[in-house]
From Swiss-Prot:
Its EC number is 2.7.11.24. A motif (TXY) lies at residues 269-271. This is Mitogen-activated protein kinase 9. GO terms for cellular component: cytoplasm; nucleus. Residues 107-398 form the Protein kinase domain. It catalyses: L-seryl-[protein] + ATP = O-phospho-L-seryl-[protein] + ADP + H(+); L-threonyl-[protein] + ATP = O-phospho-L-threonyl-[protein] + ADP + H(+). The modification Phosphothreonine is found at residue 269.
């Protein structure tokens, strides 16, 4: 009965909308009559005409939302209207966030989790995978060449450095045009907070927490340094965290790759690192050759802050910073001072009064003695006295936890990847390089681009169109279905997303030979979806051949961004071939790599009429697809396979990362369903780490 009443109210609302207004009292019997216009005024107040017009597409959604909330006559109208206003405002914000980027249809924005001079970071739901992600919008990246170079450096390094303790880029949205785009949208895995917030919000962290935190940081640093990459800006805010104690290093914008035959290994003059976590040799450009020890120092400062809950060296300027360092570590030896590069800094240290080092057991009275011994090594004033990340992992502090031979190392990065660092580039040059990085996450378009078959503009349905589709799907199912409509209800209907691209060569179209035409054909994309034959690239999962990813060269995305795992390129029934699926019963469609349609060369009115009739018959009966024999096969859509719910990554079985992932249970234990501090069979008792309560902060 309640369901029938609800449907009846829905119909009454719809009828009222169609008639231009409705009465609250007549529908619910609990409110005075109110027209649709007055209700809209309640929701939007005195907002501008432009804002009202932009939100006009959501008006019916508000009405239906209010109807659902008001099934109970005792519901409060003001509360319902306010809630509807928030939901529509969130939709409007999403449209403003994504602007004209077509991938907006794939993500549902939830809330802003970070803001800065670079742009905005929002949490979102990936509607393809149902996973939570963080989308970082970097706006006006080409306003300053230095900022654009930093963005290019970061997305390139995060593509090259794939490690569980380094934040992962899942996707980069394709811009509407490669020649004049200004913003980029980078999709990261979502992390709940950062280490700065964890330290600030928790005063009851245990020794196991401390150990596991440091272990993860050193493990990530070992991987980074084996690639000859120096992060140079490690600090708590650049270390993301989850409540399960998982840490991930982010923000590689100031990082550099050191090649043995380039000046970068000798001297860097640009600003590096936040002062509080900056190594002594960076405070005054002390040493002629920087080493990975600059990151080891930063890790030591972070670990000390974890132990005490406050920064170790909060210097107000460079001189104050040096004073704080020498107050704890003592005056450096004359041998160390003699190798200081900066003359002023050398004179200052030489004239400094003699200071004795403070015992770390006195500075950190409640800390584990083994932890303090390692910390003292990490904070050695002279960089040559600091251990490498690999040496630190073998310290007795990690006995029973670390298995250094199983920790992965990164293959050397090719010098060609960072050749742009040695040249003076224009904005257009950097724009092109960033676009090439974006194409790394769109494999088929990248292939077309490299073969010279890429168009400059891509067309997508707008976010508003997708919003309307979701509303229509809810309306048709009387509110009981999903808000996310199927890609296509019939196999013969065209896909919603179109990417302008030339056809795949015949050698990659095993079934296209039978469709070759002897008449002239048009190279224009089909503009009338009703005048074409329908072929679907959607084949049931059971008929698709699994494909194992081949090992890829360093610098190529692996795992989750592998494009064609559900079908072989040589398989005539694979997703890249034009296959008729009319023999299969109607089913929910999943996004495949390609679908094909035919573009007739010339058609008169009679032929168009016949084509329309044939198309309608095909849609109703689901018989064999109607086709024009004299036509040209062209690509209708290029979609990212990672969105498919049936997609599974298939990286190299012999890769060091895969081995490490399968061995994580050796280092971690589960406590109430979350990752806890790692233990080993060699330890007498199981040590446990509880969840860390954290709060959301600026991230990425």
């Amino acid at each position: 009965m309640a369901v029938k009443m609800r449907i009846g109210r829905r119909r009454a609302i719809q009828q009222g909308i169609a008639e231009g207004g409705f009465e609250w009292r007549r529908v619910w019997g609990c409110r005075e009559a109110d027209s649709r216009g007055a209700l809209w005024e309640l929701v939007w107040g005195e907002r501008s005409v432009r804002e009202r017009n932009a939100a006009g597409a959501a008006e019916e959604v508000i009405a239906l939302f209010i109807m659902d909330e008001m099934c109970d006559p005792a519901s409060n109208l003001e509360y319902v209207v306010e809630k509807a206003k928030c939901d529509v405002h969130r939709t409007s914000s999403a449209e403003e966030f994504f602007t004209e980027y077509g991938d907006a249809n794939r993500y549902r924005i939830q809330e802003v989790i970070g803001k800065g001079s670079y742009g905005v970071v929002c949490s979102a739901i990936d509607l393809h995978t149902r996973q939570k992600v963080a989308i970082k919008k970097v706006h006006n990246i080409f306003e300053h060449v230095s900022d654009a170079a930093r963005i290019l450096r970061e997305i390139k390094l995060l593509r090259l450095l794939r490690h569980p303790d380094i934040v992962e880029i899942k996707h980069i949205m394709l811009p509407p045009s490669r020649r004049d785009f200004k913003d980029i949208y980078v999709v990261f895995e979502l992390m709940e907070s950062d280490l700065h917030q964890v330290i600030k919000a928790n005063d009851d962290l245990t020794k196991e927490h401390y150990q596991f935190f440091l272990y993860q940081l050193l493990r990530a640093l070992k991987y980074i340094h084996t690639a000859s990459v120096y992060h140079r800006d490690l600090k708590p805010k650049n270390i993301l965290a989850n409540s399960n104690c998982k840490l991930k290093i982010c923000d590689f914008g100031l990082a550099r790759v050191a090649f043995n035959d380039t000046p970068t290994t000798v001297f860097w003059t640009d600003y590096v690192a936040t002062r509080w976590y900056r190594a002594p040799e960076l405070c005054g450009s002390f040493f002629s050759k920087y080493t990975p020890a600059i990151d080891i120092w930063s890790i030591g400062c972070i670990f000390a802050e974890v132990l005490t809950g406050k920064p170790l060296f909060p210097g107000k300027n460079v001189v104050h910073q040096l004073d704080l360092m020498t107050d704890l570590l003592g005056t450096p030896s004359m041998d160390t001072i003699s190798r200081v590069r900066n003359e002023k800094a050398r004179r200052y240290l030489s004239s400094m009064r003699k200071k004795d080092p403070v015992p770390f057991s006195q500075k950190f009275p409640n800390a584990d003695p083994l932890a303090l011994k390692l910390l003292q090594r990490l904070l050695a004033f002279d960089p040559k006295d600091r251990p490498t990340a690999e040496e630190a992992l073998t310290d007795p502090y990690f006995k029973g936890l670390s298995k250094i031979d199983r920790e992965p190392s990164c293959q050397p990065i090719r010098k060609l990847e960072f050749e742009f660092e040695q040249k003076k580039l224009s904005k257009e040059d950097i724009r092109e390089l960033i676009f090439q990085e974006i194409l790394e996450y769109h494999p088929q378009l990248q292939k077309n681009y490299r073969n010279g078959r890429e168009r400059a503009t891509f067309l997508y349905p707008s976010a508003v169109d997708q919003f309307k589709k979701q509303f229509s799907n809810l309306e048709e199912s009387n509110g009981s279905g999903s808000a996310i409509p199927m890609e296509r209800k019939h196999a013969s209907l065209p896909r919603s997303t179109t990417v302008h691209s030339t056809p795949i060569p015949p050698k990659e179209q095993p079934l296209a030979a039978s469709l070759k035409s002897s008449r002239p054909v048009s190279d224009e994309p089909c503009k009338n979806p009703w005048v074409m034959g329908g072929f679907s690239g959607n084949i049931p999962t059971s008929s698709q051949v699994s494909q194992v990813a081949k090992p890829v060269a360093p610098g190529r995305p692996v795992g989750s961004v592998f494009p064609y795992e559900t079908g072989s390129t040589n398989d005539p029934y694979g997703p890249r071939g034009p296959v008729m699926s009319s023999g299969y019963p109607p089913q929910q469609q999943i996004s495949q790599a390609y679908g094909y349609h035919q573009v007739p060369a010339r058609m008169n009115c009679v032929e168009q009429s016949q084509a329309m009739d044939a198309y309608k018959m095909h849609s109703q009966s689901q018989t064999q697809a109607y086709a024009y024999p004299n036509s040209k096969v062209t690509a209708d859509v290029a979609l990212d396979m990672r969105g498919s719910t049936f997609h599974h990554s298939a990286g190299s079985k012999n890769g060091s990362l895969d081995r490490m992932v399968t061995q994580t249970d050796i280092y971690t234990r589960s406590l109430n369903g979350i990752v806890a501090a790692a233990t080993s069979a060699g330890v007498g008792t199981n040590r446990k780490v509880g969840a860390v309560p954290i709060s959301t902060s600026r991230m990425y």
